Regions:
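PP2C/PPM-type serine/threonine phosphatase catalytic domain
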Residues: 1-255
């Protein structure tokens, strides 16, 4: 059975005087597993925060059976798209409302990931973090198609321009990943997982390293990353969900 050893979460706006359009789901027990997520409302449109809140509220309502079917991720995104589309019923100006969403469900056999947009999932591997999801941005699409190398786009515009999000107007394109525990667990049976919005991972990627003891501890990681973000001055709303899980029975942890 999967156990939650520790977790740490933060979410704060780019500026204290403006609304935070990120919405966060801290690790939540769902059946025998744990569900966590970040939704980043697309800030250039009215209703961005309502769209991200709508996505998280739907995830909170889910029962364990929602994650069992082979098309579970698709069904979840379809239902959230319906709810985001219906936001126009409460305010016609929300017609263009959109949000990204990245969620992880750590179940009995592995971690199921559903991803739309440009939040990211990272896993700790040895002494570094490995990016698991792909950004749904124009830059990443050009790289995937072999038209450019990452170094060639470093100074080009459009880095944060999305080609997929959950919206009434956009065709839904999502990434689904399943990671078995025997693929990702450390030798002690633990898994360290991180979900970050773009406001959090851009400062991380400027110097993607902390002491291994910091990577092992969600609270220390969150505190250090937050200090870095504040020191560099936030460029967007900033959100992090960091967790450490184990597949070992509780008694084995003290052997």
């Amino acid at each position: 059975m999967i156990k939650l050893l520790s977790s740490s979460v933060f979410s704060f706006p780019k500026e204290l005087t403006r609304k935070n359009e990120d919405s966060v789901l801290p690790p939540r027990k769902v059946g025998s597993g744990f569900l966590m997520a970040i939704a980043d409302g697309v800030g250039s449109y009215a209703g961005a925060s309502s769209a991200s809140e709508c996505a998280i509220e739907y995830l909170i309502s889910l029962q364990p059976a929602a994650f069992e079917s082979s098309d579970a991720v698709e069904q979840i995104f379809d239902q959230i798209k319906i709810r985001v589309s219906n936001l126009t019923n409460e305010d016609p100006s929300f017609y263009d409302a959109a949000t990204t969403l990245t969620f992880c469900y750590a179940g009995e056999k592995g971690i199921k990931i559903g991803h739309v947009g440009d939040c990211r999932v990272y896993l700790k591997s040895d002494r570094k973090l490995i990016q698991v999801t792909k950004d749904h941005t124009q830059h990443q699409m050009l790289i995937d198609e072999g038209l450019y190398k990452p170094s060639e786009l470093k100074e080009a515009g459009g880095k944060n321009t999305l080609f997929s999000a959950i919206s009434k107007k956009i065709n839904l394109r999502f990434q689904e990943i399943f990671l078995r525990y025997d693929q990702i667990c450390a030798h002690d049976g633990s898994v360290s997982l991180f979900i970050m919005s773009d406001g959090a991972y851009h400062p991380w990627e400027l110097r993607p390293r902390f002491l291994e003891s910091t990577l092992e501890d969600p609270s220390r990681f969150a505190a250090n990353l937050r200090r870095r973000i504040v020191r560099l001055v936030p460029t967007d709303d900033c959100s992090l969900v960091a967790v450490k899980l184990t597949v070992k029975p509780q008694l084995e942890l003290f052997d």
